[in-house]
């Protein structure tokens, strides 16, 4: 078999006799133009861009960005590693550009953190022919040109002077152009803050650097203990120990819960429980973040959302406090990890179960967490179980973009479904059907959890809250993970519900009318820590009764 095609990987395009600046300029042009197509598209769609002066300003911004990219290339691409680094920049830029264009996301430190924690199943859900074509056109073509290109030979000191000269000249020209367009550019960046997260590859380089700095700082700090003074209600030998199940939803947005007013019947089980008088739905709840990486640790933290920045030193979680108070704690994981929250308590990952009914191709539907639950609880300390048990179930929920995978065939209510991960290619109704089926399955799952709790003799209760919401194409945005200050309400408005058994109602001495009055009040993930402590009757200096949703209603 002939291997002549390998010649394409050998040097073949001569730049001999031409100025070496042209080499880096070609790469800079590819990065600033092809690699920033979503940025230019977003700029062109702005209402301010509606006259000749505005279009001239866009040309000035493009020229300034290209020059800035040229400076950047000459700073990082040196002869010793020129070829691989150039291709790496193309891969990084075009991959980010694809996801920005396809899902309307932006690249910031939390988005990079999410990407770094993506498991193999999530990667498979993101692969598509469109991504392959993007990489072939955006990386393969310019990458081959770059790999085969050989700059003219020059002495070592000439290489330094050529590249440093390019940095100086490019910086001067960039500064001059920025002065010309500064007024327009500053106004655009101020009024449309997402733009600053859309400039490739600077957004990715900044995000990776910021994330590395944060993680390094956290590694150097020991885990901070909290709640060492925690204690629970004294054990009554005559009373059965309570069981609390905390279900942490995934990517469920309040806008698609019919119990909250959505027009499609996505939550019939919850509504039936509500009609029976045992379930309370809190309709005005805000998430702590717009992605799991932020929201789950924040949800179980004693710190509020504003304090849970990437500069916060790591602390123990709500589960540690419950354990210190003497409760038995079990975490069941059907997602991509507990983000450190469950590291010091008993936990089971469903990926090892391989249940024949509930698990397919390495992923499991949420009902798998109920299979063998009693047996798993029995493995916990009997002494702790005599005081009370908390079980946390971390759902697969509505994790996208493959929403159609989140509900088993027999639970699909709305058809036809979008079965593509290239969400913009689906019609709105099919996409909505796939997502609503995932919500309907969550409703079914929560109904099954309540059914299991009803079989228990002791006081039982269920708390449910989603980690964050989801965008389904509103304003061209899909999925989640937008910076919090600019995130649409679909990503931050989440469902929360409480189901209480008759025995737990007596145990808490709960005031039904009082609890119903809490349903329409504004709450957030900040209330979760204190509400769960209150539900477990745990006393600690960390507990703030005014933050406990149910405190005024328990006597």
Task: Place the predicted regions along the sequence by residue.
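Alpha-helical transmembrane segments and their cytosolic membrane-interface
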Residues: 14-36
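Catalytic domains that recognize anionic headgroups
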Residues: 3-9, 21-23, 35-134, 140-555
């Amino acid at each position: 078999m002939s291997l002549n095609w390998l010649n394409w990987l050998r040097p073949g395009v001569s730049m001999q006799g031409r100025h070496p600046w042209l080499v880096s300029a070609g790469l800079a042009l590819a990065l600033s133009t092809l690699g920033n197509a979503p940025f230019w598209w977003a700029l062109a769609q702005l209402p301010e861009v509606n006259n000749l002066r505005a279009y001239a300003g866009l040309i000035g911004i493009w020229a300034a960005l290209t020059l800035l990219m040229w400076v950047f290339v000459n700073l990082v691409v040196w002869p010793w590693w020129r070829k691989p680094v150039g291709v790496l920049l193309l891969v990084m830029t075009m991959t980010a550009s694809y996801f920005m264009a396809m899902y309307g996301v932006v690249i910031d430190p939390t988005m990079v953190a999410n990407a770094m924690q993506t498991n193999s199943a999530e990667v498979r859900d993101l692969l598509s022919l469109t991504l392959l074509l993007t990489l072939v056109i955006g990386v393969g073509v310019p990458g081959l040109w770059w790999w085969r290109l050989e700059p003219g030979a020059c002495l070592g000191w000439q290489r330094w002077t050529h590249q440093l000269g390019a940095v100086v000249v490019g910086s001067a020209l960039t500064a001059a152009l920025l002065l010309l367009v500064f007024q327009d550019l500053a106004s655009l960046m101020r009024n449309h803050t997402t733009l600053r997260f859309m400039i490739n590859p600077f957004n990715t380089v900044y995000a990776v650097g910021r994330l590395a700095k944060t993680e390094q700082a956290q590694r150097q700090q020991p885990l901070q203990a909290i709640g060492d003074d925690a204690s629970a209600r004294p054990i009554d030998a005559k009373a059965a120990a309570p069981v609390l199940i905390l279900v942490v939803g995934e990517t469920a947005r309040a806008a698609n819960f019919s119990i909250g007013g959505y027009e499609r019947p996505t939550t019939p089980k919850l509504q039936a429980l509500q009609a029976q008088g045992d379930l309370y739905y809190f309709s005005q709840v805000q998430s702590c973040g717009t992605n799991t990486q932020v929201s789950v640790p924040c949800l179980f933290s004693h710190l509020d959302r504003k304090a849970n920045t990437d500069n916060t030193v790591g602390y123990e979680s709500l589960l540690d406090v419950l354990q210190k108070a003497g409760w038995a704690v079990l975490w069941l994981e059907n997602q991509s990890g507990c983000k450190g929250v469950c590291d010091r308590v008993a936990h089971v990952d469903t990926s090892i179960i391989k249940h024949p009914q509930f698990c397919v191709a390495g992923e499991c539907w949420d009902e798998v967490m109920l299979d063998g639950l009693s047996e798993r609880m029995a493995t916990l300390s009997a002494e702790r179980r005599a005081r009370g048990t908390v079980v946390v179930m971390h759902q697969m929920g509505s994790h996208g973009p493959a929403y159609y995978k989140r509900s088993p065939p027999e639970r699909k209510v709305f058809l036809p479904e979008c079965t593509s991960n290239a969400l913009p290619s689906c019609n709105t109704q099919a996409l909505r059907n796939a997502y609503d089926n995932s919500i309907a399955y969550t409703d079914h799952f929560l109904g099954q959890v309540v059914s299991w709790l009803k079989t228990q003799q002791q006081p039982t209760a269920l708390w449910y809250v989603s980690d964050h919401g989801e965008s389904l194409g509103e304003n061209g945005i899909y999925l989640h993970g937008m910076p919090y200050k600019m995130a649409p309400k679909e990503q931050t408005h989440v469902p929360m519900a409480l189901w209480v058994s008759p025995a737990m109602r007596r145990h808490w001495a709960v005031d039904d009318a009082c609890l119903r009055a809490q349903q329409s009040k504004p709450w957030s993930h900040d209330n979760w820590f204190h509400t769960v402590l209150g539900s477990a009757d745990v006393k600690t200096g960390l507990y703030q009764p005014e933050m406990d949703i149910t405190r005024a209603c328990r006597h």
